[in-house]
UniProtKB/Swiss-Prot annotation:
UniProt GO molecular function: RNA binding
Protein name from the UniProt record: Negative elongation factor D
Subunit record text: The NELF complex is composed of NELFA, NELFB, NELFCD and NELFE; NELFA and NELFCD form a stable subcomplex that binds primarily through NELFCD to the N-terminus of NELFB. Binds RNA which may help to stabilize the NELF complex on nucleic acid. In vitro, the NELFA:NELFCD subcomplex binds to ssDNA and ssRNA in a sequence- and structure-dependent manner. Interacts with ARAF1. Interacts with PCF11. Interacts with NELFB. Interacts with KAT8.
Coiled coil (UniProt feature): none
Family: Belongs to the NELF-D family.
Region (Disordered): 15-43
Xref: InterPro entries: TH1 (IPR006942)
Source organism: Sus scrofa (Pig)
Protein function: Essential component of the NELF complex, a complex that negatively regulates the elongation of transcription by RNA polymerase II. The NELF complex, which acts via an association with the DSIF complex and causes transcriptional pausing, is counteracted by the P-TEFb kinase complex.
One GO term describing the cellular component: NELF complex
Subcellular location: Nucleus
Biased composition regions of type Acidic residues, renumbered to the chain: 21-43
Length: 590
């Protein structure tokens, strides 16, 4: 924040003495810094105009302007007078006020942040990209002040914001590259300007992808939205990123994780209304199978399956030499099967239904072995049983004549079929569509509706579907069921909490407890529901506990509204026992 004092402007060692400048001025036959043939009077007037602006003595260009002025024969007296009269000491006044604030007890860091944030807001408000580009061009090289600025997080953040607002500014584009060259590319993920420069974009892409892959599922959820937004900035960035991930996905070590990230980015692009299906197919194995590529591309672009294209694929995948199964393992394509086969009220031409079922089952169950880009075996052992399970559940789910009571009679059949992952996903989608109907819970008489009971079975059989089950339960828990009275709403929410406790008991512990902790902190959930959850959880858990679980769950128990309000039978008090166990076995962080 400190500014240079007026009396310490010139450093003779660096800028040369006044005499040397005078010699240059006398040697007019030598190179003219201010331009060959330029009129001395005009140069003097231009320089005097600059000297008369406020605080010009603080400008980085002061020395160059002085040099031009003296070379044009300017008088030192005029310079001294103008610079002195127009010196208002804005920077020094800020420093003085900052010192006063610190002396009154304000933390120095807080003072610095206040000054910097105010300066940032002023720069963003008054930034002129044309002036910035002209100053940059005049410098002829990277200004020292710019290199100093990018060394600080505050000013890098300023450049990111300015670059977003002024993507065509050459000075900002160059600055973003400088920041990337300095090793800060991990910060640039949200800057669209970075997407215009291949060198910067490739660095940012590499750093961002490494960050996602190193952190597992939790890191994926945290960083994917920003990563996907950057990749989907334009067709060129999407193609470049997907091509790179397509190559990395072939690696034995970590290839499947990269493929997952690529598929999540495809989903993001689709949700934003972009049709990237042709790029997806071109980067896969579809290019070698033009008929299959055409059929897939047509359905993906329209967002719907159709009998003609399904028939093309069916013939190819029932032939003696079918295409690679990877061809139809496109998440967006499989989602279309979920809608066609499991959505209530969906209509499929009965003559073609077996083709739909066969292709979905084939994608879900067939295992291929490849060596040196050549397929050496196709294992179809589970194809028939998977097809049968999909068909059975499809007939149950899409039969509008079957009510809840009829479904109860078919529960054992449903439970058997749910053991197949693809069927479990279909049932989960079907349950979501069914219970999301506004009048669904109004018509239920059972304490635990059969559709919610199916979620328990899915949680038991399929760990990979735990996040989707919790997502559905949270959505239902937070929905305003205005058609039910207050007591019915409480009972429904207790039932949903019971499903969450079951999910917790099957291993999805931290996400469930984290959600309830947030409910308690936001104060938007009836406290009796939190007590119900705590009671049920204490009933199913036992030592040893992980530190992460204790740090999340213990504060819920110690909350004033929870502690001492849970009734227990006899001498057994699980709340007190849990708290005592934690305090004796863990170092608790407040």
């Amino acid at each position: 924040m400190a500014g240079a004092a007026p009396g310490a402007i010139m450093d003779e060692d660096y800028f040369g003495s006044a005499a040397e400048w005078g010699d240059e001025a006398d040697g007019g036959q030598q190179e003219d810094d201010y331009g060959e043939g330029e009129d001395d009077a005009e140069v003097q007037q231009e320089c005097l105009h600059k000297f008369s602006t406020r605080d010009y003595i603080m400008e980085p260009s002061i020395f160059n302007t002085l040099k031009r002025y003296f070379q044009a024969g300017g008088s030192p007296e005029n310079v001294i007078q103008l610079l002195s009269e127009n010196y208002t000491a804005v920077a020094q006044t800020v420093n003085l006020l900052a010192e006063w604030l610190i002396q009154t007890g304000v933390e120095p860091v807080q003072v610095q942040e206040t000054v910097e944030n105010h300066l940032k807001s002023l720069l963003i408000k008054h930034f002129d990209p044309r002036k910035a580009d002209s100053i940059f061009t005049e410098e002829g090289e990277t200004p020292a002040w710019l290199e100093q600025m990018i060394a600080h997080t505050t000013w890098r953040d300023l450049f990111y914001k300015l670059a977003e607002a002024h993507p065509d500014c050459l000075m900002l584009n160059f600055t973003v590259k400088l920041i990337s060259d300095a090793g800060y590319q991990g910060e640039i993920t949200s800057v669209s300007t970075a997407c215009q420069q291949l060198e910067v974009f490739s660095r940012v892409l590499r750093t961002s992808l490494a960050t996602i892959l190193d952190g597992g599922e939790e890191n994926l959820e945290k960083h994917l939205p920003e990563f996907a937004k950057m990749v989907c900035h334009g067709e060129h960035t999407y193609l470049f990123a997907q091509a790179m991930m397509s190559v990395l996905a072939q690696e034995e070590q970590g290839g499947s994780a990269v493929r997952r990230v690529a598929q999540e980015v495809q989903r993001f692009a689709q949700e934003k209304g972009h049709d990237a299906s042709q790029i997806t197919l071109a980067l896969g194995t579809a290019a070698s199978y033009p008929r299959a590529c055409q059929a897939l591309g047509a359905m993906l672009s329209k967002g719907a399956l159709n009998p003609a294209d399904i028939t093309v694929l069916f013939k190819m995948f029932t032939s003696m030499d079918p295409p690679p199964v990877e061809l139809i393992r496109v998440p967006a394509f499989l989602d279309l099967f979920m809608q066609s086969l499991f959505k209530p009220g969906a209509r499929i031409n009965q003559d073609h239904k077996h083709k739909y079922i066969h292709i979905l089952a084939y994608a879900a169950s067939v295992v291929e072995t490849w060596k040196k880009n050549k397929r050496v075996s196709i294992n179809k052992d589970e194809l028939k049983s998977t097809s049968k399970a999909v068909e059975t559940v499809h007939n149950l789910c899409c039969n509008e004549n079957k009510g809840a009571s009829e479904l109860v009679a078919e529960l054992s059949t449903l439970y058997q079929c749910i053991r197949f992952p693809v069927v479990a996903m279909g049932v989960l989608k079907w349950v979501d569509w069914t219970v999301s109907e506004p009048r669904y819970f109004q018509l239920q008489t059972d304490h635990t509706p059969v559709h919610l009971a199916l979620l328990d079975e899915i949680s038991t059989c399929h760990q990979l579907l735990h996040p989707q089950v919790l997502q559905l339960l949270v959505k239902l828990f937070e929905t305003e069921h205005s058609q039910l009275d207050v007591m019915e709403q409480l009972e429904l929410k207790k039932t949903l909490l019971d499903r969450m406790v079951h999910l917790l008991s099957r291993g999805h512990v931290l996400p469930v407890v984290s959600y309830i902790r947030k409910c308690l902190e936001k104060l938007d959930t009836d406290i009796s529901l939190i007590r119900h959850f705590v009671t049920e959880v204490l009933d199913v858990i036992a030592p040893p506990y992980t530190s992460d679980f204790v740090q999340l769950f213990l504060p819920i128990l110690e909350n004033d509204s929870i502690a001492g309000t849970i009734k227990t039978e006899g001498e057994h008090d699980p709340v007190t026992e849990f708290i005592a166990h934690c305090k004796s076995n863990f170092i608790l962080v407040n």
